Amino acid sequence: MSTDITTRTDVNTQIAETGIFSTVNASTMEGKAAVYKALNDATPLRDVVGETLSVKDIIVQRVEVETDEGDVVEQPRTSLITSDGAAYSATSNGVFSAVKNILGIFGHPSTWESPLKVVVEEKATRRNAMYRYLTLSLV
């Protein structure tokens, strides 16, 4: 079982090698447009906290962000594409961790019988209740 999970979809390796991971079939113009929209015009996940999304595809892109101290660090930007074609994204380790778990357990979205329903949640960190993070929960 453990090798099954790691060989299904190795997100970290693909991001390290190419800077991006995508489950979208980009062999068509429609697929390429979906990737473009997800990377450039997605609704922030923070805007849909508490809502249920029917996820059909996932894109994770390595991006550079500036910290409060002015340092530039790399973070994963995760984009979720829903069954109605909408795209939602967040630069959040919590969402990225949830997506890795989803892919590890459920496999590549092309193998899903139907879109996966998730709820966007915002939670406080364990160490400091002032800092919050986004995550996904299954419905």
Predicted regions and their residues:
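Short, charged beta-turn/beta-strand-edge "cap" motif at the junction between a beta-strand
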Residues: 108-110, 119-139
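N-terminal start-of-chain detector that recognizes signal peptides
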Residues: 25-27, 89-91, 106
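OB-fold ssDNA-binding interfaces and closely related basic DNA-contact patches used
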Residues: 1-83, 126-127, 135-139
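Generic hydrophobic, helix-prone segments enriched in Leu/Val/Ile
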Residues: 53-55, 99-102, 120, 134-136
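GIY-YIG-like beta-to-alpha core
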Residues: 88-100
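Short nucleic-acid-contacting surface segments enriched for D/E, G, S/T with interspersed K/R
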Residues: 98-119
